[in-house]
């Protein structure tokens, strides 16, 4: 039997977030995670087990390596589907996450900027799907790319997203099946429910907020505002 896992990491980072000596982000993200996982437990339609990795790391580089190794070890332990959702995400309506129709490693929506370096279409990697049918070649590609990490200009922030985009775009997925913004609505500057803010984000994502199933807040900026908004949304949709 194939198991389903919802995974996330909220780790103390010794050197701080992007070299900012801030301990408040860890506390903020712990609060966000509790709201996030509660939303997935309410709305995900398939059975799943939630896992949170909390072991401390020295810096952002170690953070990405630790998360990759944890996901890889879990995937190789038993037949399973793994859905990664960052702590600053919230699900807002019933959703099938672990569909057998999806056979490949997935990202779901653009990030900001929408293009970057060798990627004309650059996707956000804080929501990812590792199905049990994911190919060994894509796992191997992800492993091989660690050899490019040391000394890379984006080593301490962004390299992992480059690596994940390389894995995603290497696969033979129909172009019509790559973009699924309703599973990763990018709410990067959404901090209130003002009509103006919502409309700006609807335009960016190409869908209406009310049609989104998962929102991603990019909460290292305006963390307390995000917590307040996640609490508001949680009450509105009956999570708390």
Language model regions located:
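A structural signal for short, well-ordered beta-strand segments and their strand-loop junctions
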Residues: 6, 49-52, 83-86, 107-109, ...
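GT-A fold catalytic core of metal-dependent nucleotide-sugar glycosyltransferases
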Residues: 60-122, 128-133
């Amino acid at each position: 039997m194939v198991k389903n896992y919802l995974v996330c990491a909220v780790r103390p980072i010794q050197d701080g977030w992007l070299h900012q000596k801030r301990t408040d982000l860890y506390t903020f993200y712990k609060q966000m995670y509790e709201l996030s996982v509660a939303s997935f437990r309410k709305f995900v339609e398939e059975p799943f087990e939630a896992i949170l990795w909390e072991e401390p790391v020295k810096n952002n580089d170690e953070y990405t390596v630790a998360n990759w190794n944890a996901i890889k070890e879990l995937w190789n332990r038993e037949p399973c589907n793994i859905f990664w959702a960052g702590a600053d995400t919230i699900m807002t309506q019933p959703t099938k996450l672990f569909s057998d129709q999806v056979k490949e490693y997935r990202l779901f929506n653009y990030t900001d900027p929408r293009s970057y370096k060798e990627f004309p279409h650059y996707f956000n990697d804080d929501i990812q799907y590792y199905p049990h049918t994911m190919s060994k070649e894509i796992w191997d590609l992800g492993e091989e790319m660690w050899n490019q990490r040391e000394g890379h200009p984006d080593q301490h922030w962004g390299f992992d997203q480059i690596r994940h985009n390389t894995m995603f775009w290497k696969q033979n997925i129909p172009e019509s099946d790559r973009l699924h913004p309703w599973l990763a609505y990018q709410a990067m500057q959404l901090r209130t429910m003002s009509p103006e803010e919502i409309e700006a984000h609807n335009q960016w994502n190409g869908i209406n907020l009310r049609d989104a199933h998962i929102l991603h807040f990019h909460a290292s900026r305006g963390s307390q505002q995000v917590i307040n908004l996640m609490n508001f949304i949680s009450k509105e949709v009956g999570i708390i």
